[in-house]
């Protein structure tokens, strides 16, 4: 081997040793690329000095560290990766928010004035106002703006009612709505006991299971007027109803699932009950025996229509003896009642003003003349019980009494007449502007 060949190999080994030292200094695994004897890679980067090689190695080390960090962050889906770059490049820049021009007049007026403005807005506009700023959010959620709400004929999504009750609604109409399960979230049910501000609640013909209805009624202890017409009940529902000690009006017309225990709890605890509608509830003899002897003495308007085979003279007399202040009574479609019930009615209820006895065929027509003894008696409904001749004779005998003027009973019903969006005379919808 010639001396020239030996010299070139020694120079190549010497230069290769320098490259190993450079790579070792920057701690990067690029030995293979820079130990190539033909130096193609070096010529591509136009490396002419060791100083330039060090700078190039430093750039490769940064890229390697960035790739390792991105690989590590990709394992965590909740970690937002950030990119490293040179000082002369900017990948992300936060745009400054445009500053509003002009005068903010709302900052110069008090919260009370803003609330007076907000009270004329519908609920959908209030929700939009709550997204403007923190101050508007607090004001738009004020309880004075959410006293009444009409959710009738709507499909209510799960847990929406929980949000609505927390805003302080006291007058709520849910008639003919569909309330989807669950009514309340798990966090709410497992948290500390909380009670709503509801005082007037209309649940007539609502689509809901008895279990969910019991959960809804469990947070209501301040109710004054309640309607659960045409709902399926259970013992838990009745017990939750009975915890409303200030309840004065209760509409249970056409309800199913009523038990003697549930009725007894309502009679014992709701001592301020004034109007009670139990029509067409298919009360059994056990229910009547558990309820009527304990009927609240404050009841003035009572609807017992539709009990064709269970309500007899004995049961009605027990109820009448407990309610001396009876003003309106509906005993229509009670086929077992006789003249004896009528005589007790005239004796124990001297303040009676309105009587419904339609289709009670076992009550003789002559018993209606006994009602003339009552000084305050004004209205009598006897549809399909008297002939035209008997009806004309009765009108001549009692000229001051209006006969067959009211087709339907309004006892404890939340919505009557043309006021279809009001419950018990209270407005539920937003004012029109």
Give the location of each predicted region.
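C-terminal capping region of solenoid repeat domains
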Residues: 2-79, 84, 100, 113, ...
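N-terminal adaptor-interaction module of cullin-RING ubiquitin ligase components
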Residues: 2-192, 199, 214, 239
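Amphipathic alpha-helical protein-protein interaction segments
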Residues: 95-110, 119-129, 154, 202-206, ...
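Inter-repeat linker/turn residues at the boundaries of leucine-rich repeats
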Residues: 134, 144, 167, 193-196, ...
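Conserved hydrophobic beta-strand positions in leucine-rich repeat
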Residues: 149, 172-175, 199-203, 226-228, ...
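Short, solvent-exposed loop/turn at the beta-strand->alpha-helix junction
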Residues: 154-159, 178-186, 206-212, 231-237, ...
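A generic tandem-repeat structural signature
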Residues: 173-265
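Solenoidal tandem-repeat scaffolds enriched in leucines and small polar residues
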Residues: 224-312, 316-319
